[in-house]
Amino acid sequence: MTATKLHKKVILVGDGAVGSSYAFALVNQGIAQELGIIEIPQLFEKAVGDALDLSHALPFTSPKKIYAAKYEDCADADLVVITAGAPQKPGETRLDLVGKNLAINKSIVTQVVESGFNGIFLVAANPVDVLTYSTWKFSGFPKERVIGSGTSLDSARFRQALAEKLNVDARSVHAYIMGEHGDSEFAVWSHANIAGVNLEEFLKDKENVQEAELVELFEGVRDAAYTIINKKGATYYGIAVALARITKAILDDENAVLPLSVFQEGQYGVNNIFIGQPAIVGAHGIVRPVNIPLNDAEQQKMKASADELQAIIDEAWKNPEFQEASKN
C-alpha cells in the first residue's frame, strides 16, 4: 500500500463480539473508505445485518462502503484483520485455545491468500502470538506484513492502571507490557515514565504508593481478561479500539511506535517466533522493532515468555497438516 492511496480498504474476518466492536470503532473514528465483513456461511446474515446497522451511522461520521464480504473481496484489500476464532471461556487460558484456533486460522489464511491478497495481515484472535506465527507460516508473506495485536491492549491497561493510581492522564503515562499476550507477559518497569520522568523518580513525591501496590497493580493488568470474562463473558471494547489504532497507523503510514506481536531475529536472544514488543508500524507493515534495553530481570522474563510460546508452537507443528500447509 502506498502512503498516498486515497481509497483504503479493510476486510474483517470474524463478526463476533470483537469483530463487530472493531467495525464500530472504524466507523466511529472515520477510518478507511471501505469495510468488508466476512463470516462463516451460517452467520452470513449477521454480517449483512451488522453492515446495514453500521451504515446508518455514516451520516454522523464519514462516507464508507460497508458490506458483508466473501473471500474474493480480499484481492484488492490493504488490510485483512482476523478476529475469528473459538472464544476464550471462563477458566481457559489463551494458550488452551491453540488446537481449535490453529485449524480455523489455517482455513482463513489459505482462502485470503488464494484471493490474490497482497496487503497486510493484522491478527487479533487468541492466542495471538501463536496465531500471528501461523498466519505467517500459512501465508508465505514477508514477516513485516504479518502483525499481531500483541501487547497493545495489555500496555493500554497498564497505562490506565498507573494513571488511576497516580491521578494523571493515561495519555501522559508511557509504559509497556512485553512478552506473550497472556500469563507470561511482564511489565517493563525500568522504562515506565510519566511525561518523561522515570516512574521511580516520579514516585518519590508519592510516599503513599508502596512497591506491593505496584506488584498488585501489574497482576490486575495481567489478569484483567479473566476478570472481565468472569463478569461479562468476553472482552471486546478495549481490543477493538486497540485494533482501530493499529489500523490507522498502517493506513495513514504513521510510523507509529506500538507494542505489537513482532517477528524475532535475535533481539532479546529470541528467534523465529512472534512476541510482544514495541515496533514502528506504517503503510508497509513493520518498519522495524524498537528494542528497549531490558534489565536482567526483565530479560529473563522475556526469555521465559518466549520459551513458553516456542514450546506451544513446537508441539502444534508436530501436526502434519500444519507442516504441509507451511510456506515460510
Curated annotation (Swiss-Prot):
Entry protein name: L-lactate dehydrogenase
Single GO term (MF): L-lactate dehydrogenase activity
Amino-acid positions noted as binding substrate in the UniProt annotation, renumbered to this chain: 88, 94, 126-129, 154-157, 235
Family label: Belongs to the LDH/MDH superfamily. LDH family.
Catalytic activity: (S)-lactate + NAD(+) = pyruvate + NADH + H(+)
GO cellular component terms, semicolon-separated: cytoplasm
Residues annotated as binding beta-D-fructose 1,6-bisphosphate: 159, 174
